[in-house]
Design a protein with these regions (language model features):
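Specific alpha-helical transmembrane segments that line the substrate/conduction pathway
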Residues: 5-16, 46, 54-87, 92, ...
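Specific transmembrane alpha-helical segments of multi-pass solute transporters/efflux pumps
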Residues: 25-69, 105, 190-209
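Transmembrane alpha-helical segments that form core, pore/gating elements
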Residues: 3, 15-18, 76-78, 114-172
Length: 221
C-alpha cells in the first residue's frame, strides 16, 4: 500500500476512534467560523508536514530520513527564541550547533553524495520538521487551546485527512484499498495508538508546558 494511503487510513481510523469517544461523552461538535479557520491552518501544516516526510523517504534511506525529521525540537527552540524571546543558554546553543553539524554529515555532502536528489530529500525532511515545530509553537497562543483536547484533535486530523485525500487524488488518482484483515487491524491500531492517543496527549501537554519542552520530551517517545 502506498504511504499516502496509509496516512489517510491512519487519520481516518484515528478520527473514528476519537469520534466514538466524543459521541460517548456527548460532546458538542459545533465550531465557530473563526475556530474553523484556526483549526484548518493547523491541519494544513500537519498535512503538509506529513506529505513532505513521505516524499522525503523517496530520496533518502528511511533511517536517515527519520533522524532528520527529529530536527523539530531544534526548530521549536529556535522559533521560541526568535519570536517568543525564550532564553538561550550556552548549553542549548552547543546542542543546536551539534544538531546542525549532524544534519550536515547526514546530508552526504562531505562524502561526495550530495546529489540533487539527496538535497531535495534533505529539504523535504527539514521542511517536515519545521512545519511540525511551527504547529507546536503557535498552538498554545491560539484561542482554540481552550477547546476540549479530544474535540480539537479530532478536527485537526479530520481536516488533515481531507487534505491528504485531495493530495492522493491529484497525484496518484486513487487511494489504495484495504486488501486483507491484517492490513485492517494494523491500520486501526496505527490510527488508535500513535495517532489518536499520542496526539490527544500532545495537545494536553502543550496546554500545560512550553512548546520546547513538549518537543524535546516528544522526541524521546
Amino acid at each position: 500500500m502506498h504511504s499516502t494511503s496509509v496516512l489517510i487510513y491512519r487519520y481516518a481510523f484515528g478520527c473514528l476512534a476519537m469520534l466514538g469517544m466524543l459521541m460517548f461523552h456527548r460532546t458538542r461538535m459545533w465550531l465557530a467560523f473563526g475556530d474553523f479557520l484556526r483549526i484548518l491552518l493547523l491541519s494544513s501544516m500537519y498535512a503538509v508536514s506529513s506529505i513532505a516526510l513521505i516524499e522525503g523517504y523517496n530520496y533518502m534511506a528511511s533511517g536517515i530520513a527519520t533522524t532528520l525529521l527529529f530536527s523539530y525540537p531544534v526548530w521549536t527552540l529556535l522559533l521560541s527564541v526568535v519570536f517568543l524571546h525564550e532564553r538561550l543558554s550556552l548549553t542549548t546553543t552547543l546542542a543546536i550547533g551539534i544538531a546542525v553539524v549532524g544534519v550536515f554529515f547526514l546530508s552526504g555532502i562531505l562524502d561526495g553524495d550530495g546529489s540533487m536528489e539527496g538535497l531535495t530529500g534533505l529539504f523535504l525532511l527539514l521542511l517536515s520538521g519545521f512545519l511540525y515545530a511551527v504547529y507546536m509553537v503557535i498552538f498554545p497562543r491560539m484561542r482554540i487551546r481552550q477547546m476540549p483536547s479530544l474535540k480539537l484533535t479530532f478536527y485537526i486530523f479530520f481536516f488533515a485527512m481531507l487534505i491528504l485525500t485531495l493530495y492522493a487524488t491529484f497525484t496518484r488518482g486513487r487511494i489504495d484499498p484495504i486488501d486483507t484483515r491484517s492490513q485492517l487491524i494494523n491500520l486501526f491500531l496505527l490510527g488508535l495508538v500513535p495517532t489518536a492517543i499520542s496526539n490527544v496527549t500532545l495537545i494536553m501537554a502543550l496546554k500545560q508546558i512550553s512548546s520546547t519542552m513538549a518537543a524535546v520530551l516528544g522526541a524521546f517517545v
